[in-house]
Amino acid sequence: MHPRVLAGFLFFSWTACWSLPLPSDGDSEDLSEEDFQFAESYLKSYYYPQNPAGILKKTAASSVIDRLREMQSFFGLEVTGRLDDNTLDIMKKPRCGVPDVGEYNVFPRTLKWSKMNLTYRIVNYTPDLTHSEVEKAFRKAFKVWSDVTPLNFTRIHNGTADIMISFGTKEHGDFYPFDGPSGLLAHAFPPGPNYGGDAHFDDDETWTSSSKGYNLFLVAAHEFGHSLGLDHSKDPGALMFPIYTYTGKSHFMLPDDDVQGIQSLYGPGDEDPYSKHPKTPDKCDPSLSLDAITSLRGETLIFKDRFFWRLHPQQVEAELFLTKSFGPELPNRIDAAYEHPSHDLIFIFRGRKFWALSGYDILEDYPKKISELGFPKHVKKISAALHFEDSGKTLFFSENQVWSYDDTNHVMDKDYPRLIEEVFPGIGDKVDAVYQKNGYIYFFNGPIQFEYSIWSNRIVRVMTTNSLLWC
């Protein structure tokens, strides 16, 4: 990620707007006129350069397709220049109000603070949390950045601080209005005088310290990144990615992309509690290994660490998402997954628990324990799973064994477990992930995948794991 000039304090003048002929995907017949108007507004807000007076540059009107392409590229979508369901879904996700483009040539250089000791002041509070909860969230959010830089943050209670923090609704005094519940959550301004560094939070949102509503700590940590001079990142695993995703209750660790960005401005600190920071996986890494694979309504989901790639059958470029985008109830990292097409369900496993999802929605009464499937107590995790729709059987792989589950009678088959090498000779004694396609089973073991013929019961081809992602 590169720290660039931000547009947080460039004001919008909607009197200068015009109609943009937004192209659509011919297959997306369910898109409404309201959807197209929303998409136009989104692109104007986040992908059109403005001049210092806040007026949209008229040269941008002829480049609507380019802006749509830029937005699709930024979020790792298939770049078509046409509005489709996937693009619209991304546009409708809750996000930061700072634009994603860096074409704001009104500043001579990248902005950063010229000092390491900064002050902040909480001007007012949200009624959603106690004062102490709000103060704790902001204190933690600043610590995210001070842990990896020489920066120090001190709270003051009166006067003007470097970073003034406030809650407001709709038009709240900076000519950059909020939009009510969801949508735009907050915005912040880059280092500088007046509004410079200030962070504003939409009080029409429900702010929480949990997975419900919007977690104030996570949003604040992101906004304070802007207050320090960081732009949005294209890395979906970065804190500075513009879309909000709840990342879990466990201790937050600043991703490597954000560390590199902030240290390029202020240098490293000497009190970083972590020797390593989480990195987003590279799909073309020759040593790539996988955690799980499953199909979902014709698409393929490929899980690695706290992410999954979404691979469309007619596309080469895979889209990368956080696993938590399924929902905050899911774990950050999973062990196994499989689809049950006739029930329109996928099952996701982590440790001794599993979840059932219909599409991207988690079913009630989950998670359940894997012991309910018939696994004995000594089985601590499922490493891979594969469902056969025609026979109603599901194979579960755990350590060096494979189990066969009868989905019709909801019992384990009597002749199992068996050794993996005995049932599928040649693939090794463990399976990281597995899926089937066109009469072949694909077993993944570290950086290697085996193409196994169901008809001849033998390996017919050995490939690299990353070839699944067209590398």
UniProtKB/Swiss-Prot annotation:
List of residues binding Ca(2+) 1: D128, D203, E205
PANTHER family linked to this entry: COLLAGENASE 3 (PTHR10201:SF165), MATRIX METALLOPROTEINASE (PTHR10201)
Main location (coarse class): secreted
Keywords for the protein's UniProt record, in alphabetical order: Calcium, Collagen degradation, Disulfide bond, Extracellular matrix, Glycoprotein, Hydrolase, Metal-binding, Metalloprotease, Phosphoprotein, Protease, Repeat, Secreted, Signal, Zinc, Zymogen
Residues holding Zn(2+) 2: C96, H222, H226, H232, M240
Positions with a binding annotation for Ca(2+) 5: I293, A337, A385, V434
Signal sequence coordinates: 1-19
Entry's family note: Belongs to the peptidase M10A family.
Swiss-Prot/TrEMBL Hemopexin repeat ranges: 281-330, 331-377, 379-427, 428-471
List of residues binding Zn(2+) 1: H172, D174, H187, H200
Cofactor: record remark: Can bind about 5 Ca(2+) ions per subunit.
Binding site for Ca(2+) 2: D162, N194, G196, D198
Protein's cellular compartments: Secreted, Extracellular space, Extracellular matrix; Secreted
GO biological process terms held by the UniProt record: bone morphogenesis; collagen catabolic process; extracellular matrix disassembly; extracellular matrix organization; proteolysis
SMART domains, per the entry: HX, ZnMc
Cofactor list: Ca(2+); Zn(2+)
Gene: MMP13
PTM comment, free text: The proenzyme is activated by removal of the propeptide; this cleavage can be effected by other matrix metalloproteinases, such as MMP2, MMP3 and MMP14 and may involve several cleavage steps. Cleavage can also be autocatalytic, after partial maturation by another protease or after treatment with 4-aminophenylmercuric acetate (APMA) (in vitro).
Cystine crosslinks: C284-C471
Written domain comment of the UniProt record: The C-terminal region binds to collagen.
InterPro entries tied to this protein: Hemopexin-like_dom, Hemopexin-like_dom_sf, Hemopexin-like_repeat, M10A_MMP, MetalloPept_cat_dom_sf, Pept_M10_metallopeptidase, Pept_M10A, Pept_M10A_Zn_BS
Residue window of motif Cysteine switch: 94-101
Record-annotated active site: E223
Binding site for Ca(2+) 3: D179, G180, S182, L184, D202, E205
Organism name: Bos taurus
Annotated region (Disordered), positions in chain: 264-283
Protein name, as recorded: Collagenase 3
